[in-house]
């Protein structure tokens, strides 16, 4: 009440915001071979800010690291998710090398070999570390590393010329 005997009242609504429960789930394995990807999905709010700068609810990850997201709900309250570790495994170095000329006459051959890896799948069906092609064709190898990752080598073209008749 003031000096004139007047009084006033004000209604105030207090909103007690509750922090959202920020969670991250992976849409696949978080350890994968080079060239792979995993989608990380955020939940618990209406807006999202990932530690890599993305502002979408879901992110597609191809690089290793720890990923977390700040989630904000409709009341403007925020919370940070736990970190999700993404590991990217190195693919083997897949190089096929010809040890000799790749163009030769019928009856000849050339050794094509690779190194590294633990298993090999050549385009001609061989599973050895090296092959000795005697027919024309394009040869490459899929190498599997100790970590299970694969890589395809360069292609080597072999040309076998017929022996001329007299």
Task: Please provide the spans of the model-predicted regions.
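Proline- and Ser/Thr-rich low-complexity, intrinsically disordered segments
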Residues: 1-166
């Amino acid at each position: 009440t003031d000096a004139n005997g007047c009084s006033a009242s004000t209604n105030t609504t207090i909103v007690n915001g509750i922090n959202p429960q920020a969670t991250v789930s992976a849409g696949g394995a978080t350890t994968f071979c080079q060239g792979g990807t995993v989608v990380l999905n955020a939940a618990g709010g209406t807006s999202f800010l990932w530690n890599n700068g993305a502002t979408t609810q879901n992110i597609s990850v191809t690089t290793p690291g720890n990923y977390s997201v700040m989630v904000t709900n409709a009341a403007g309250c925020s919370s940070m998710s736990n970190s999700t570790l993404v590991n990217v495994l190195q693919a083997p170095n897949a190089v096929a090398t010809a040890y000799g000329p790749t163009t030769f006459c019928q009856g000849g051959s050339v050794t094509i070999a690779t190194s590294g890896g633990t298993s090999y799948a050549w385009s001609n069906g061989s599973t050895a570390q090296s092959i000795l092609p005697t027919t024309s064709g394009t040869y490459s190898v899929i190498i599997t590393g100790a970590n299970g990752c694969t890589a395809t080598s360069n292609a080597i073209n072999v040309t076998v010329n017929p022996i001329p008749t007299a």
